[in-house]
Amino acid sequence: MSDITLKDMARKPDALVCGARLCAGCDETIVVRQVMKATRGPTIVTNATGCLEVSTSIFPYTSWEVPWIHCAFENVAAVASGIEATIKAMHKKKEGPLAKYPKVDVIAFAGDGGTYDIGFQALSGTIKHEHDFTYVLLENEAYMNTGIQRSGGTPFGASTTTSPAGKAIHGKTETKKPIDEIIIAHGTPYVATINTAWPLDVMKKARKAIEVDGPTFLHSLAPCSRGWRFPPEKTVEVGRLATQTCVFPLFECRQEKGRPVYELSAPSLAIAKKPESKKPIEAYLEQQGRFRHFFKPTRNEALLKELQESIDTRWQILCEKAGV
């Protein structure tokens, strides 16, 4: 893997520049800028309908400095596969506008609605056909662009407009899909979770993903101040707490001889080695209005215990897979 340093990345021009209309404090712009810093040269981006798409391409303006294609909600991976196949054909025939470039990075961005739910069929097929591209999941844990509706990525207990917290039902009643495990089960060569609170880790993982010959998957937690109900200046802080509480652990998974090999990233490895440093789930939930029913009008110990036990179990399983 090519060396990545913060100094070099800071000097590299941004692929996503000013003019975006995303909400104040939106983590998606941070994720995209960090991931795009890791590209090697000519790059083509496909973008599913969602917050990032509608806010960076308001006609007749664009915030993108690279070729960029707006896709439907459900087909961003399919469009990326078509681009990648076209590039291969140009290289094989040694003709066409992209034939002169030895490498053209293809990156697909989509939210959790376009990944967990509406776009999963296309994503699954594109991975199994082994197209060479990097898929970046920008997970803000709901359909934020259309009004904060629950998605397959919405966590247990979260209050949304379609899973409102009330006296009878305390927010979403189901757990979120284990999307990373689902993608790993496809035999995907490289899967990693990323968090903008650790920018160098993001860029190193993005470069690893891009350099792999085949489909790769980056899963970014993208805190949403509007949907999660926290002050916009706390975006990175809330994201950091997600990892420090093991709600969103950081790891990598690569395939070796047909077997998935897990490796915890530094922030999560430190917790595995020193379990007492793991923060309780309340530290994360208390920051967000979507979970205020866990604490008001009275503290709901049963809900907190259920969620804490679920997180602890998933964390223990991940540590076992990583051999720590």
What are these model-derived regions, one by one?
Residues 3-135, 148-158, 172, 185:
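Cofactor-binding active-site loop characterized by glycine-rich and histidine/acidic residues
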Residues 53, 140-145, 225-227:
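Short gly/pro/ser/thr-enriched loop/turn and capping motifs at secondary-structure boundaries
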Residues 137, 192-194, 217-221:
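Short, conserved beta-strand edge motifs with alternating hydrophobic and charged residues
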Residues 152-172, 235-249:
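Acidic, Ser/Thr-rich peripheral helices and adjacent loops at domain boundaries
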Residues 167-171, 188, 193, 206:
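Ligand/cofactor pocket segment of small-molecule handling proteins
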Residues 170-188:
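A structural motif
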Residues 202-324:
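Glycine/aspartate-rich loop-and-adjacent alpha/beta segment that forms the canonical ThDP
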